[in-house]
Structures are given as structure tokens and as C-alpha cells.
Amino acid sequence: MGFPAAALLCALCCGLLAPAARAGYSEERCSWRGSGLTQEPGSVGQLALACAEGAVEWLYPAGALRLTLGGPDPRARPGIACLRPVRPFAGAQVFAERAGGALELLLAEGPGPAGGRCVRWGPRERRALFLQATPHQDISRRVAAFRFELREDGRPELPPQAHGLGVDGACRPCSDAELLLAACTSDFVIHGIIHGVTHDVELQESVITVVAARVLRQTPPLFQAGRSGDQGLTSIRTPLRCGVHPGPGTFLFMGWSRFGEARLGCAPRFQEFRRAYEAARAAHLHPCEVALH
């Protein structure tokens, strides 16, 4: 979703620095909590959070806020930010600011992906979010709150889908090319079987319980492979609408860590991945080495 650059720049340049935005920081400046009731009409509050993890809570949203994430030079390297709304998320929309002033919608009022949304900024883009209050006729209590995680992009040469971006709510098998990229770039790569699947209707998520026979990679540590007499059970989450159900055989589970939880990216049967990997390796087209044995 894009907005004219001129409109954004006008809002940022002409808006007043809201007094409410200057207060409300946590001691370490990782989080912010404030209210739109003390914000001057038409103002754009300027916020800056320097930590890799934190939270924002905007009570009675009014006007707009511009939030910069990262250290003193947030444009030094490409970065990936993930936002997870606190439900019910109401009263505002959250956009990622893009080069040229365009805005990309990340969070909106109403139901959405329980796991949140992620955005990737390039090396010349400022890591900034634009929070805009949505108009309402009544004065009911509304809260727009979310947690965020920010990390450096260690493989900026790879396409966005390799970082788990743009797959929120996607329910389709991964192509061979996507499988190979996922094996090289996912936060975790687990060889195991499905022990069971449960469904959380409230969060609109399915929870896959996996017996991890072998952990090929994990960053940060999320799983422990089963030892003799001990099953290494772990949980991986995926959107409910994907209709995941238990199946026989061994799989290669690949995905990303979001707020301490494992979220599924691709889960081919192990033999299916082996076939794709060995074919790519024979043609010298594999993006990285994967220890299958």
C-alpha cells in the first residue's frame, strides 16, 4: 500500500512534536507508552527506540506518530523488523516507511495474523514506522499496542521470501527453489515427524507438535533433538486456515523464530527435499551445503 511522498513529508514536516511523545519511554528506551488524549490536534509525535526488542502502547490514538527503530545510524545495514499486535488492536494503523515516502501497511484494526507481520528495510532506507489514528465517532477506550523485534539482515543478497517475509498467512507448498532457500536462511531446520496437531480458534493458529530427530540448524536455540528414551518434542505454529493435519513419514521443518516461538515456513517430506537438493547440487545450483546425513 503506497501513499504519495509529498503527503507524508508534509505531515512529518508540518506536524508539531507532540508533548505526549516526549514522555512515556521506558528507562532503557526500549518501549514507549503514551496517550493521544494529551496530543495536540494535527501533531505528529516523533519517537525513537534503540533496542532490538521492545513494545509500543498507544492509548486513545489521535493524530499520528513516527517511530524510528535502531541505533544512532539505523541506515547502516539492511534490517528486518517484525511486529506482533496485542489483541484487540484498535484505534490506529501501522505502516512501514519506505524510500521516497511511500507507506506499506503492516497492522490494521480488526483480526489479522496472530504471528504479526515483518518488513525488510534496505541499506538506504530508514527503519521507521508511521502510526496513524483511525477516525471514530465515539470515545470508547481503544488501544493500539504491539511488540517488535529488530535484527540485522545477514543475507541481504537473497530475495525477501528467503527471510520469511511476505509469507504471513500463505497456505501453499513451497517450490523447489523456495525449499533450497529456506534450508539456507531459515532460523531453524529440523528433521523429524509430526506427533500431533492442535488448533487454537481464538488465535487462528494451528500448533504442530514435532518429534525432532535431528536439528540441522537453529538460531536462536529453540529445539532439542530426542535422545535415547527421550522424545525431543517441540511446537511449531502456522495459520489455522492452512488446514495442517498429521501425516506419516519424516519431514524437514523450516521456519523462523518470532517472539520466542517457532513459525513454520516450509515443511517438505524429507525425501522430497533430498531429491530437490541433490538435483540442484548435481547442477551446481544449490545456494548452500546442507548436511543430510
From Swiss-Prot:
InterPro entries for this protein: Meteorin-like (IPR051998)
First and last residue of the signal peptide: 1-23
A Gene Ontology molecular function term of the record: hormone activity
Predominant cellular place of this UniProt entry's protein: secreted
The UniProt record lists the keyword Membrane: no
Keyword terms: Developmental protein, Differentiation, Disulfide bond, Neurogenesis, Secreted, Signal
Annotated localization: Secreted
Keyword Acetylation: no
Disulfide bond residue pairs: C30-C51, C82-C118, C171-C242, C174-C266, C184-C288
One of the protein's GO biological processes: positive regulation of axonogenesis
Source species, domain of life: Eukaryota
A Gene Ontology cellular-component term: extracellular space
Protein family (similarity comment): Belongs to the meteorin family.
Subunit relationships: Monomer.
Task of the protein: Involved in both glial cell differentiation and axonal network formation during neurogenesis. Promotes astrocyte differentiation and transforms cerebellar astrocytes into radial glia. Also induces axonal extension in small and intermediate neurons of sensory ganglia by activating nearby satellite glia.
Protein name per its UniProtKB record: Meteorin
Organism listed in the record: Homo sapiens
